[in-house]
Amino acid sequence: MRTYISGSRRLSNIFWALTITLGGLGFFLNGCSSYFNTNLLIFSDASSIAFIPQGIILMFYGTVALILGLFLCLTIIWDVGFGYNDYNADQITVYRKGFPGKNRELNLTFPSEVVKSIKVRVTEGLNPRRQLFLCLKDSREIPLTGVDQPAALNKIENEAVTLAKYLNVFLETE
């Protein structure tokens, strides 16, 4: 039994990456327009803005936004967070993709005998969370759900019950 976890390639992440990048480009070009006393933007005239202090601040904010937008775009391209959970009778594998480097891929494999239970953690409030954890006998808790929008409560409960029955372990709630 295999379940896939969505990574950072979501519509909301793409929206924010484009919004921050385009906004940062506008701020940066606005600051450059005030420095060169020429209009680099089609939709506004920024050449009349004083370079010190307004233009320099616009360039700073634009640079920060462009760097943040680049980070978000690279996160989407690399699909950070994507992975799967693979459950077999003899072993359980948790695989996730991360940022490039030495530890780009996280691949955890556990024998089924070390699994103590499946835990459901539901947190309501301003930042609601509904998570599944694989609890091991040595008190480690391995998260099995992604970080996208919280799933419906009955969906998480059904997934937890199905998984606990399949692995023949207890089901805990918190």
Swiss-Prot record:
Superkingdom of the organism of origin: Eukaryota
Localization (cell): Plastid, Chloroplast thylakoid membrane
GO CC entries: chloroplast thylakoid membrane; photosystem I
Family matches, as InterPro entries: PSI_Ycf4_assembly
A Pfam family of this chain: Ycf4
Keyword Oxidoreductase: no
GO biological process, one term: photosynthesis
Protein name as it appears in the record: Photosystem I assembly protein Ycf4
Membrane topology category: Multi-pass membrane protein
UniProt keywords, alphabetically: Chloroplast, Membrane, Photosynthesis, Plastid, Thylakoid, Transmembrane, Transmembrane helix
Function statement: Seems to be required for the assembly of the photosystem I complex.
Keyword Thylakoid appears in the UniProt entry: yes
Parts of the chain that traverse the membrane: 11-31, 56-76
Major localization class: plastid
Similarity comment text for this entry: Belongs to the Ycf4 family.
